[in-house]
Amino acid sequence: MALEQTLKKDWYSILGADPSANMSDLKQKYQKLILLYHPDKQSADVPAGTMEECMQKFIEIDQAWKILGNEETKKKYDLQRHEDELRNVGPVDAQVRLEEMSWNQGDESFFLSCRCGGKYTVSKDEAQEATLISCDACSLIVELLHQS
């Protein structure tokens, strides 16, 4: 399943979880829901329409766990989700290259001062994939350009 195809769904809300939930909480919510909607757990006298809804919900829950239950796919999903949120917030104020940003050895991140006095910050790991970075003090956004 391609991650791009699944970004339209909010996998956290499908599991009834907060995006800041840890892996243990996500697993607990998944297990609770999967038991509730598992086709084998439904009674035989459930109407066909309801059974189909339960099956669809079961599939969605399983898909959510396949993405959120794996550290690598969860990280990619979270990053893309964050970028989508930024894209919906407002227009890009500027385009910058990583070389234009300063290095913070303390927390191993790159940063750039914003005209409001705040900072655009991106971790070393996120810098490889991130394209949009929001200011920590205002609504401005910069686009991080990657070398081609």
Swiss-Prot record:
Functional summary from the UniProt entry: The iron-bound form is redox-active and can function as electron carrier. Stimulates the ATPase activity of several Hsp70-type chaperones. This ability is enhanced by iron-binding. Plays a role in the diphthamide biosynthesis, a post-translational modification of histidine which occurs in translation elongation factor 2 (EEF2).
Keywords, in A-Z order: Cytoplasm, Cytoskeleton, Electron transport, Iron, Metal-binding, Transport, Zinc
Ligand binding (Zn(2+)): 114, 116, 135, 138
Description of its domains: The DPH-type metal-binding (MB) domain can bind either zinc or iron ions.
Subunit description: Monomer and homooligomer. Iron binding promotes oligomerization.
Residue ranges constituting the J domain according to the UniProt record: 10-81
Keyword Metal-binding attributed: yes
Family (UniProt): Belongs to the DPH4 family.
Domain of life of the source: Eukaryota
Alphabetical list of CDD domains matching this protein: DnaJ (cd06257)
Cellular component GO terms held in the UniProt record: actin cytoskeleton; cytoplasm
Tissue expression remark: Detected in heart, brain, spleen, lung, liver, kidney and testis.
Gene assigned in the entry: Dnajc24
MF-aspect GO terms: ATPase activator activity; ferrous iron binding; zinc ion binding
Compartments it resides in: Cytoplasm, Cytoskeleton
Domain spans labelled DPH-type MB: 92-147
Protein name: DnaJ homolog subfamily C member 24
Any Gene Ontology biological process: protein histidyl modification to diphthamide
UniProt note: phenotype after gene disruption: High embryonic lethality at 14.5 dpc. As early as 10.5 dpc, embryos are smaller than their wild-type littermates. Embryos that survive long enough to initiate digit formation show one or more additional preaxial digits.
Pathway info: Protein modification; peptidyl-diphthamide biosynthesis
Record carries keyword 4Fe-4S: no
Native source organism of the sequence: Mus musculus (Mouse)
